Amino acid sequence: MANINLKEITLIVGVVTACYWNSLFCGFVFDDVSAILDNKDLHPSTPLKTLFQNDFWGTPMSEERSHKSYRPLTVLTFRLNYLLSELKPMSYHLLNMIFHAVVSVIFLKVCKLFLDNKSSVIASLLFAVHPIHTEAVTGVVGRAELLSSIFFLAAFLSYTRSKGPDNSIIWTPIALTVFLVAVATLCKEQGITVVGICCVYEVFIAQGYTLPLLCTTAGQFLRGKGSIPFSMLQTLVKLIVLMFSTLLLVVIRVQVIQSQLPVFTRFDNPAAVSPTPTRQLTFNYLLPVNAWLLLNPSELCCDWTMGTIPLIESLLDIRNLATFTFFCFLGMLGVFSIRYSGDSSKTVLMALCLMALPFIPASNLFFPVGFVVAERVLYVPSMGFCILVAHGWQKISTKSVFKKLSWICLSMVILTHSLKTFHRNWDWESEYTLFMSALKVNKNNAKLWNNVGHALENEKNFERALKYFLQATHVQPDDIGAHMNVGRTYKNLNRTKEAEESYMMAKSLMPQIIPGKKYAARIAPNHLNVYINLANLIRANESRLEEADQLYRQAISMRPDFKQAYISRGELLLKMNKPLKAKEAYLKALELDRNNADLWYNLAIVHIELKEPNEALKKNFNRALELNPKHKLALFNSAIVMQESGEVKLRPEARKRLLSYINEEPLDANGYFNLGMLAMDDKKDNEAEIWMKKAIKLQADFRSALFNLALLYSQTAKELKALPILEELLRYYPDHIKGLILKGDILMNQKKDILGAKKCFERILEMDPSNVQGKHNLCVVYFEEKDLLKAERCLLETLALAPHEEYIQRHLNIVRDKISSSSFIEPIFPTSKISSVEGKKIPTESVKEIRGESRQTQIVKTSDNKSQSKSNKQLGKNGDEETPHKTTKDIKEIEKKRVAALKRLEEIERILNGE
């Protein structure tokens, strides 16, 4: 076995770098979104064991909607990327490029088993630059192919060392081969096919058998005229070990998918659901299509599903000629490779094996796959193609007549392939560029029109997105997903009538209800979202809530394990004020997915509605944060529950969670505001001031932050600093009653501006004539103005509003005594005492605001059809409402203030009585 040298490695790595360096500037596109951005298995908070329970896309293998692609080792490398750079795509693309270089170098070593040094380097160069590999290398999810190929080739190289002197068996390389096959299979399923290549290598290369020799030996043995040679028995033992190991891996793999194949729609692979002979003719035609992509990769497309390749429905279809030609050529090469024993036939045989065997899982031979053509599955088969081309070039270049021409042609192929690969990488820069490049190749694929629409939709360009979605419905009128996309876009454009019509059209395309029929086997999971989307749309109308609930129940009846339907129904039931039923829906969803942080969060909201804050906090919010320590809504709202509980011991944890929240959401003023409220509760006035100012800096019109900052200044003897804050508050909210009361108090007591205070109290009564606090304070203003008769009338009106308030009656009696004695010379109410009459004037314990902005309950929505509908659920009370819970300490403080107010009232009464 020839070794590879440093020059060859440098050449290969340099060529790979030159072709793929621009891929470092591409983002996450197409399948990368599901496998990387939306895959929670990448997050450090997800237990490692979960990687071995979920499929490649992060869906539990036990779920019917799972793709059943089991590649935990590939996901593990994604997780390592995430650990190093989180979701920055450059590191992911860099590692892919490195893996491709490694594969190319190992492939060079494999080539030297069958080709001379020069041809081996050429084959490796052809492989390194082939444009068909851009999907596998530049698309991050193509790493499954890259990793699997590394262990695929390593397993084969290990097996080539299993033959010892005198044809003896060396078991260590065989054991290593089995291990590497298992690893390759855990990277991608096609890794297991290397066992077939090892078997072919053992029989036809290592032992040098040909088909005629095998037939002769078998015939003699069956006729009893001879025995099986010992070397052949040894070969048989090795083959049995390989086959048994393979069978064991297959059994384990079947157990992993729980003997279930993934559910695909007829749009994913139209031929798979077509009748005979359409299915067979089309499947066979796909073989020359794939071969042509290897031979002429000029028109590449990221998606070959739906109507990309029309079905072959007749034997008279001209495309059958391509199928016939392909099989003739393949047959001739096959006969040549297994009939003759020369080096050339061995090279051709191994090339054909590398082309054919790894392609079998994607060939629809044993089971239908979810695509028509996929360029990245040609990554390993292209190795055999490159060996075949290099071997052919070797044969031609040895003839002096064609030597120069062969070098020119080879150089042109490598150069053009390199340029094509480099240019093709730019198509993968973004989803929009990728799908637009695909539409240049194929305009009959509705999925491509949909995907361009999705790319524009992500940019909030709904008008343009709608055009592409509508075109998708024209290209494929029975595409349920396209009509759902149209409906969602109409909804985003606030055209609800058209949105409902589109959803109804999609719903009409769903299979009709058949009693006793199991729908899970016939309906793609994402298509059931039409019921969810339609229900989410119509439930905006309060009169149609029952109709929406019926849609959710219909979806559940079709798929009892449809988690999203339970989640959405639970949200609706909360809106219908049925928290107990909502709780049942969420608990059912939790039975299907107990590791969903959003579900635990939603259940916490239900317990809040049921007035069970302790249950919400201890069991649900905390569980959500165990599963996802960065769950923003759980961090925020659990902190609010702790704060509102009034338990001093919970305040440090509430503060910790709010600090984590602002770390995740640094631009949300609510986090800073609630930190300020916690600081006020802890009497940390300076800290509270800092947090409130930060909240106001982020949101200048933050009603609650403005008022509570002014209140803080008022409580800390900084009334004059409170005044400009109140002016700002009343500029945004001129009807803010408590702000007007506080402003009037400061104007009366600090600024001695009786007229300004009077305007504040009069403004309050314009908005709320029955406001006792404002009315009484206005009476005090009249008293200060020495208008006793007006003060008397005012107090009478106030007493009518609050007949049980004794202090109003006493003040009325005092005023009447003053009128009757006619001894009114100077102001009887000292302005410095006004704000404390009976504790009714700006009682600080009753004006603290506990919430600035309502928060949203995040409801998990199925993302297959990019449904983004969310529902609001307010936690806590609005900004001007009083604190709902008081601790014993708070109550004592309030009582102290009330007693102090009574003492001040006695002082006022003594002054009124002339004492």
UniProtKB/Swiss-Prot annotation:
Ranges of Basic and acidic residues composition bias in the record: 878-892
Originating gene: TMTC3
Topological domain spans for side Extracellular: 30-93, 188-193, 253-317, 375-376, 424-915
Name of the protein: Protein O-mannosyl-transferase TMTC3
Biased composition (Low complexity): 865-874
SUPFAM superfamilies, sorted: TPR-like
Regions of this protein lying in the Cytoplasmic compartment: 1-8, 115-120, 159-166, 215-231, 339-353, 398-404
Disease implicated: Lissencephaly 8: A form of lissencephaly, a disorder of cortical development characterized by agyria or pachygyria and disorganization of the clear neuronal lamination of normal six-layered cortex. LIS8 patients manifest delayed psychomotor development, intellectual disability with poor or absent speech, early-onset refractory seizures, hypotonia, cortical gyral abnormalities, and hypoplasia of the corpus callosum, brainstem and cerebellum. LIS8 inheritance is autosomal recessive.
UniProt topology in membrane: Multi-pass membrane protein
Pathway(s) served: Protein modification; protein glycosylation
Subcellular location, principal: membrane
Keyword Transmembrane helix: yes
Annotated glycosylation sites: 494, 541, 865
Residue positions where Phosphotyrosine is found in the record: 503
Pfam families assigned to the protein according to its UniProt record, in alphabetical order: TMTC_DUF1736, TPR_17, TPR_8
